[in-house]
Curated annotation (Swiss-Prot):
It holds the Pfam family Porphobil_deamC. The gene is hemC. One of its GO terms (cellular component) is cytoplasm. The keyword Transferase applies. GO terms for molecular function: hydroxymethylbilane synthase activity. It catalyses: 4 porphobilinogen + H2O = hydroxymethylbilane + 4 NH4(+). This is Porphobilinogen deaminase. It comes from Vibrio vulnificus (strain YJ016). GO terms for biological process: protoporphyrinogen IX biosynthetic process.
Amino acid sequence: MTHSTPIRIATRKSPLALWQAYYVKDALQKAHPGLEVELVTMVTKGDVILDTPLAKVGGKGLFVKELEVAMLEGRADLAVHSMKDVPVDFPEGLGLVTICEREDPRDAFVSNTYHHVDELPQGAVVGTCSLRRQCQLKAYRPDLVIKELRGNVGTRLSKLDAGEYDAIILAAAGLKRLELEERIRSFIEPEQSLPAVGQGAVGIECRTNDERILKLLEPLNHADTADRVKCERAMNLTLEGGCQVPIGSYALLEGDEIWLRALVGEPDGSEIVRGEIRGPRAQAEQLGVQLANQLLDEGAREILTKLYQDHE
């Protein structure tokens, strides 16, 4: 079967973004032999503003806006995202249509000196740009000093190697995809640090009325991952979670059931509201909403209100 018009994938230029774009390109060409796929690379605001915490300059949506404009203007057909960077709302005419199989969703502890969080001496400096990681780390080890860490994976590792940090926390999936797994000293299990919503999964956004693209993307959707991520995202949407708030969540499938764990906390870890829920997989999104409301009733509402007021 021949496909005359090439598919254009909008992507950022960072090594991890390019890995994800090539991953989708390869999957499309494997599913549809003869299909031409081109990459349209672009720089986003999130790539340019590196001296300010994400939460203060508009959150993770900074990494996707330019890609979305390219699709709406017809310069690209689809965009590939790391699911943990995808905002809960989409511009009119665009939507998240495909979620690919999830990589390792855990956080990774990276250090040149220490093997584990428990080995860090009192007052050690740990780098992360995630309020979620900061919150859980400070709750576990209040003595640690958390220092802002921005830039792509290579930049962050360079800063560690330059001695600016005793350790840094990164997503395990990104290190594995960039073949940097040897830098991981230990994995941080969900029991100690719940991942970000959708962490480790790759999502594909496109125009919701583009029948050709929707059809081509169908074989790339991974139903198990999609149900888990939809459950986590439904919870996040109900909490109105953004980059400014420490929210962790992790959904697991157990047969026909889905098990969702989640938390909302103060950035300094002084207060964390946790909860979990189990129910039929077919009700994944309803369960996410249910758990979010439970967390809100148990104290998360006050935490979130305060945090959003602080950022106004």
